[in-house]
Amino acid sequence: MPAYHSSFLSLTDVPTTGNIAMLPLKTKFRGPAYPADESQMDIIDECIGLFRANCFFRNFEIKGPADRTLIYGTLFISECLGRVNGLNYRDAERQLNSLALENFSIPGSAGFPLNALYAPPLSPQDAEIMRTYLTQFRQELAYRLLSHVYATEKDHPSKWWTCFSKRRFMNKAL
């Protein structure tokens, strides 16, 4: 059974930075992403929806820039789930907010674990656009993930989600 790929691969007019698709987001966080249609699914919804199925795969055939955005989202969800294990909703919210905003490596920098799969930004301006898009992406993903992980109880995270925190998608971590 193959891994699930992004449904946004067929979009042709999506801007890219490096070779990451800067897909529209349904978000209230500031950043360079275009606003998505509220009635449609965006890449954040897709990352959350496909996470549990895709996290079991060690190999993932990249078919386009939207798949690279999906991979980044899947790896970020894994990191988030590792951080919220055992925390109540308020503490998890603070933890994930600081995780989303902390300094992180982008493709092309020495600390980025997926440099073999991602192209570096072409210029310093492109690097800044990539960093701000990924920051906006991380903030929105962390915010929406909390509503899934704490859907039933606010005292502790759902075991249905945290059981996936030890799984390594593609044997990688951010």
UniProtKB/Swiss-Prot annotation:
Cytoplasm recorded as keyword: yes
GO cellular component: actin cortical patch; Arp2/3 protein complex; cell division site; cell tip; cytosol; nucleus
Subcellular location(s) of the protein: Cytoplasm, Cytoskeleton, Actin patch
Keyword annotations of the record: Actin-binding, Cytoplasm, Cytoskeleton
Entry's Gene Ontology molecular function annotations: actin filament binding
Annotated GO biological process: actin cortical patch assembly; actin cortical patch organization; actin filament branching; Arp2/3 complex-mediated actin nucleation; endocytosis; establishment or maintenance of cell polarity; regulation of actin filament polymerization
Pfam families: P21-Arc
Main localization (coarse): cytoplasm
InterPro entries given in the database record: ARPC3, ARPC3_sf
PANTHER family assigned to the protein according to its UniProt record, in alphabetical order: ARP2/3 COMPLEX 21 KD SUBUNIT
Self-association and partners: Component of the Arp2/3 complex composed of arp2, act2, arc1/p41-ARC, arc2/p34-ARC, arc3/p21-ARC, arc4/p20-ARC and arc5/p16-ARC.
Functional description taken from the UniProt entry: Functions as a component of the Arp2/3 complex which is involved in regulation of actin polymerization and together with an activating nucleation-promoting factor (NPF) mediates the formation of branched actin networks.
Recorded family membership: Belongs to the ARPC3 family.
Record's protein name: Actin-related protein 2/3 complex subunit 3
Organism: Schizosaccharomyces pombe (strain 972 / ATCC 24843)
